[in-house]
Amino acid sequence: GALPRSVSYDYSHPEHSYNLTWSVDGLVNEYIRPCRVKKDGVAMEVHPLDGLVSVILDGTEYEAAYTSGGIGSLVRDLTNVPNIHYMTLRYPGHYKYVRSVIHETHGNFESTKNIFLKKFPTTDDDVIVVYANALGKDASGFPVRRSYYNKFYGVDGLTGIQSTTAGSGVAMLELMIAGKVQGIVDHSTVSLADFTATEAFRKYYKTSK
């Protein structure tokens, strides 16, 4: 989730649980377009904003719901994983407000966008909260859980969302110059070791403020 680093939450104004830190067009797309998931080995689409859950990370409470686009090619690539889904983290109360807006606009892109522009303040003081959770079984058949959690901040005058979004593109250019990738490539096919060894990764994926 791309979030403001702090909010002053007023339950009479639930729109204050969020600030615009990136493209409002991208935000609306996340909330109104179908979401790709895989359930019991079957790829399918689910409604955006469904599946609402509460998540506590390092003592901070968030909520998460299905959003469109972020899953990328995982459903296609992870053929041996029966269940895959992608959600976006927000501060509590945000999705209830968004649902009310989309109900009011009947999911119309421009109408939803205009309300967001009027209601959500903009900020450059953002943080990118990343949480990945995997459940499975070990060789003996016992349940195992592995998770990753981190926060990423902006560097060199860039916001967190600018750094993390542009950083992967810069890393790919760095790998192309080094001859490690050629032509048009899907980011998911690039070696993780090569990607994390780039100067762009070390510079733009900053986990401390």
List the model feature ranges, each with a label.
Residues G1-K209:
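C-terminal catalytic/substrate-binding lobe primarily of soluble NAD(P)-dependent oxidoreductases
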